[in-house]
Amino acid sequence: MTSLPKVLFLMGPTASGKTALALDMAEHHNCEIISVDSALIYRGMDIGTAKPTASELARAPHKLIDILDPLESYSAADFRADAVREIEETLSRGKTPLLVGGTMMYFKTLLDGLSPLPSADDAVRAQIAAEVEARGWQALHDELRNIDPVSAERIHPNDPQRLSRAIEVYRISGKTLTELTKIKAESLPYHMVQFAIAPQDRTVLHGLIAKRFQQMLAEGFIGEVETLKARGDLHLELPSMRCVGYRQAWQYLDGEFDHATMVEKAVAATRQLAKRQLTWLRGWPELHWLASGDEGNLDKLVQQSR
């Protein structure tokens, strides 16, 4: 039996029922909710992110939502630092931290730590961009293959962001991305009990995703995106505006396609997100699975987290 303080993870794809289960857990079992969602961090992005409603937040406050303006960026390292602070504060109140969300990279940084990668260097990036202009991405990929064949095998020549970053890391640090990612931060001093919730039938999940997007539209999602566009300082290259649904609604408002196409593209993008989330979870160690909609989920969560 571990003497470490207990921390609960409740993971799952979008639209799987995480919030409802977390609210029940927080209300009845001395838990406090910490959000693990890279979209819920942004203020003014409520409908399209399925942010908990005012009444839900009154039942159980959520930490790490509405902490940034959509213009600001937020890294996995930022999340880890914020989450550890919230976990410690929750434990100090004699409560159990319940981390809920679908941003798997954030959960992974809590479990595995972060590799000590160097910060971006504008001068090195400019040099790489000039070389690409002169020689092309394939030449850069050939260079990566010579210095770091493992990363070159994983990174496609047509993935400029990751390819450029791998070269940049080597030029700044003198170490390859493969070498640095093997170095992990010290593990956190908690006993992590991990759950995932998802429908057993993927077609059910697809139906829930489509239904939820229609509900968002009925609640005024397009108006929400219009308000964000009207600010004048936001654009589609920002991480906030790359959230599923927002990009497609923005492009619709720009006249790039009609309403029906926007709905189709947004639902398809959300399905792709759910597929990636499930892919992460299928390879996740020490995971307790719950079926979406099962009336016994709360009891299972309580019993298996003891």
Swiss-Prot record:
Superkingdom, taxonomy of origin: Bacteria
Residue(s) at site: Interaction with substrate tRNA: T103, R125
Alphabetical UniProt keywords: ATP-binding, Magnesium, Nucleotide-binding, Transferase, tRNA processing
Chain residues that bind substrate: T14, A15, S16, G17, K18, T19
Reaction catalysis annotation: adenosine(37) in tRNA + dimethylallyl diphosphate = N(6)-dimethylallyladenosine(37) in tRNA + diphosphate
Binding positions for ATP per the UniProt entry: G12, P13, T14, A15, S16, G17, K18, T19
Region annotation Interaction with substrate tRNA: where it falls in the sequence: 37-40, 161-165, 242-247
GO biological process terms held by the UniProt record: tRNA modification
Pfam family of the protein (one): IPPT
Listed GO MF terms: ATP binding; tRNA dimethylallyltransferase activity
Cofactor dependency: Mg(2+)
Coiled coil region boundaries: none
EC number of this enzyme: 2.5.1.75
Subunit structure comment from the entry: Monomer.
Family recorded in the similarity comment: Belongs to the IPP transferase family.
NCBIfam families: miaA
Its biological purpose: Catalyzes the transfer of a dimethylallyl group onto the adenine at position 37 in tRNAs that read codons beginning with uridine, leading to the formation of N6-(dimethylallyl)adenosine (i(6)A).
PANTHER family: TRNA DIMETHYLALLYLTRANSFERASE
Protein name: tRNA dimethylallyltransferase
Organism this protein belongs to: Shewanella amazonensis (strain ATCC BAA-1098 / SB2B)
